[in-house]
Amino acid sequence: MLKKIFSNGFTQKQKKMNKYLILTVIIFNLLSCNSENKNNTVFIQGGGTLNDWANLSKYAESNKELIDDLDENRVVFMGNSITEGWSNFNPDFFINNPFVNRGISGQTTPQMLIRFKPDVINLKPTAVVILAGINDIAGNTGPIKIENIAENIFSMSEIALANNIEVFICSVLPAKAFPWSPSIKNVSKKVIELNLLLKDYCLENNIQYVDYHSVMDDGNGGLKVPEHTTENDLVHPNKDGYKVMEGVILNFLAFK
């Protein structure tokens, strides 16, 4: 009987010690992960890192230079990879004009909203061209309703207007699918839905609506292949696609 009692008591004590041991291991692992994140950059979809979700650091140094060299005709292009890639296909479009490219690949509207002040407002431009929303539809930083995407763009617009900056809101370019997010369905319909919200907002608030969509649509909701994009891409313009966009936006900015 004594042996049985001792055995049972030892087992219960051992179980209790095991629980403490497991808890200690879990806490140690969590602390190790936090320490590792401090030393190693962890990149996230949407163009940032865990330590800089909106990628505020990308243009920080360049912004300092522009603040010290203000241009009363400056126009900032705010956007994602479609805007950022513009400078790669035709750098002269920005070099030969008072245009500043503030596109960041992969970004969504909440990320842009966070960096809107340092990357746009602080540069004191006369106007801002906002092209955003396609990565939100792709779910780059998680699911989001179409109306919430639009509201983020409206917020950027209202911040600009409050700072006496003229606003040009661009339609989202046509797209039928996302090669990096093939599970997203009805892409072209979602693009059209977002564009309708943007267009209505512009009409109601006397803001210029820049319609890239209608001139680049292949008739089935996608970019024209091979005229404006490649069959392996379907989302980003090629050189000729950017030329079309330049012709459209310059009609709005000619008076600047």
Indicate residue ranges for each PLM-predicted region:
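Serine-esterase "nucleophile elbow" of acetyl-processing enzymes
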Residues: 37-127
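Sec-dependent signal peptide recognition
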Residues: 18-24
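Solvent-exposed loop/turn segments at secondary-structure junctions
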Residues: 81-85, 105-109, 134-138, 173-177, ...
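Charged, glycine-enriched surface loops/patches
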Residues: 145-170, 197-207
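Catalytic His-Asp segment of secreted/periplasmic serine-dependent ester chemistry enzymes
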Residues: 173-256
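Active-site segments of SGNH/GDSL-like serine hydrolases
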Residues: 131-137, 158-191
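N-terminal secretory signal peptides that target proteins for export/translocation
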Residues: 1-17
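C-terminal motif of bacterial Sec signal peptides marking the signal peptidase cleavage site
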Residues: 30-32
